Curated annotation (Swiss-Prot):
Glycans are attached at N55, N172. This is Neuronal acetylcholine receptor subunit alpha-3. It is found in: Synaptic cell membrane; Cell membrane; Endoplasmic reticulum; Golgi apparatus. Belongs to the ligand-gated ion channel (TC 1.A.9) family. Acetylcholine receptor (TC 1.A.9.1) subfamily. Alpha-3/CHRNA3 sub-subfamily. The lineage of its organism: Eukaryota, Metazoa, Chordata, Craniata, Vertebrata. It comes from Homo sapiens (Human).
Length: 505
């Protein structure tokens, strides 16, 4: 039974378990006791205000590097760039050296940053908040006296935003770090690497970092005689334009191309001006949206603002031209007389240039009125009741075969030759001039003459109205092509500017 699986646990009595626990905690206690002694020894007479140099004339060499964690936001309106950075600072403090063998082999020690001397490195072009970083993080001490402090900080730095090519713009935002109170004789900065550390960078959804080189400068300011060193990072960023392309540029392009269709819309539908004004109102709404996303500056006009302004002028001109076209379209002979040059240019020349064909008129194929001949004039007389009573037989004349009609036909035959060479109205006048015609026939012929002249006047007026409508159609077609070319060339010219500027740079 003692050889069973429960024999080992049963052999460990409570005193033995307590002894094993104490033995396992002994190294930890030794390490904690060693670190405690080390901490007490290091900071027994340590003053965090005094520079850690053996000779007062020696500068403290600060190795400095900035790591970008996140590009939080770029505020174009207030011209502020918000970033999340890690500021790596390394220097040597001769007061914080120890022999690891005297303290249980401890080579490193982490202490609160408030306990040690730190360089007062600030962001010179800070726009909002504290200029210095928070010192609540701990610093790493090495037995050689090397101190490494990497505090995180969120900075809101001033950045001059150039919105000339918005939303296809590139920005150059600088971040200038340096000691605020120590000059180069007290603190000297050394740049770690040649650019900002982007290994832990979290990609932004709106901006892409092209490069971030760093430079060291020694500057003498007007306030002081000493030289102050600083390390400046130039952050070159490019805006990702996908959001603005989908939500702003493409709708504006589609709306602007609707302006071209105004000139293809027939004038008789009565919706040309309505379409123009609708496009103008839509662009106005887009302009109001854009003004909230660009800086409130009068130095430059952003690219999207130029395009909207171009399109609004474009639409306004289309409204003016449409009103003029409608004025031409509804002109009549009673209000306007078409000049000869208008007929030549807009009815003959420009339609051929614009490849416009007008349906041919059927007036040439229509049967012209035939003048009345002598026999027909005599028959008109014989058909009258008054003259039919004059027939010798006393019966109505049929087909003009009675003797009396035959006598009248010979009498008026002398007028036939002249009447055949006259117009229809002249023939009617000739008929009316014959005293032999009865009053009923004269009245009927006068009525026919009135109707014919009225119809002829209406046809002539309709032809003139059709000419004015065709002139308006030609003007519409001209501006259709003109506005199409201007819209395409203007759009391409505006949005190719960032590409050309990038190549020049």
């Amino acid at each position: 039974m003692g050889s069973g699986p429960l024999s080992l646990p049963l052999a460990l009595s409570p005193p033995r378990l307590l002894l094993l626990l104490l033995l396992s905690l002994l190294p930890v206690a030794r390490a904690s006791e060693a670190e405690h002694r080390l901490f007490e020894r290091l900071f027994e007479d340590y003053n965090e205000i005094i520079r850690p140099v053996a000779n007062v004339s020696d500068p403290v060499i600060i190795h400095f590097e900035v790591s970008m964690s996140q590009l939080v936001k770029v505020d174009e309106v207030n011209q502020i760039m918000e970033t999340n950075l890690w500021l790596k600072q390394i220097w040597n403090d001769y007061k914080l050296k120890w022999n690891p063998s005297d303290y249980g082999g401890a080579e490193f020690m982490r202490v609160p940053a408030q306990k040690i001397w730190k360089p007062d490195i600030v962001l010179y072009n800070n726009a909002v908040g504290d200029f210095q970083v928070d010192d609540k993080t701990k610093a790493l001490l090495k037995y050689t006296g090397e101190v490494t402090w990497i505090p995180p900080a969120i900075f809101k730095s001033s950045c001059k935003i150039d919105v000339t090519y918005f939303p296809f713009d590139y920005q150059n935002c600088t971040m200038k770090f340096g000691s605020w109170s120590y000059d180069k004789a007290k603190i000297d900065l050394v740049l770690i690497g040649s650019s900002m550390n982007l290994k832990d960078y979290w990609e932004s959804g709106e901006w892409a970092i092209i490069k971030a080189p760093g430079y060291k400068h020694d500057i003498k300011y007007n306030c002081c005689e000493e030289i102050y060193p600083d390390i400046t990072y130039s952050l070159y960023i490019r805006r990702l334009p996908l959001f603005y392309t989908i939500n702003l540029i493409i709708p504006c392009l589609l709306i602007s191309f609707l302006t071209v269709l105004v000139f293809y819309l027939p004038s008789d539908c009565g919706e040309k001006v309505t379409l123009c004004i609708s496009v103008l109102l839509s662009l106005t709404v887009f302009l109001l949206v854009i003004t909230e996303t660009i800086p409130s500056t009068s130095l430059v006009i952003p690219l999207i603002g130029e395009y909207l302004l171009f399109t609004m002028i474009f639409v306004t001109l289309s409204i003016v031209i449409t009103v003029f076209v409608l004025n031409v379209h509804y002109r009549t002979p009673t209000t306007h007389t078409m000049p000869s040059w208008v007929k030549t240019v807009f009815l003959n020349l420009l339609p051929r240039v614009m490849f416009m064909t007008r349906p041919t008129s059927n007036e040439g194929n229509a049967q012209k009125p035939r003048p009345l001949y002598g026999a027909e004039l005599s028959n008109l007389n014989c058909f009258s009741r008054a003259e039919s009573k004059g027939c010798k037989e006393g019966y109505p004349c049929q087909d003009g075969m009675c003797g009396y009609c035959h006598h009248r036909r010979i009498k008026i035959s002398n007028f036939s030759a002249n009447l055949t060479r006259s117009s229809s109205s002249e023939s009617v006048d000739a008929v009316l001039s014959l005293s032999a015609l009865s009053p009923e026939i004269k009245e009927a012929i006068q009525s026919v003459k009135y109707i014919a002249e009225n119809m002829k006047a209406q046809n002539e007026a309709k032809e003139i109205q059709d000419d004015w409508k065709y002139v308006a159609m030609v003007i519409d077609r001209i501006f259709l092509w003109v506005f199409t070319l201007v819209c395409i060339l203007g759009t391409a010219g505006l949005f190719l500017q960032p590409l050309m500027a990038r190549e020049d740079a």
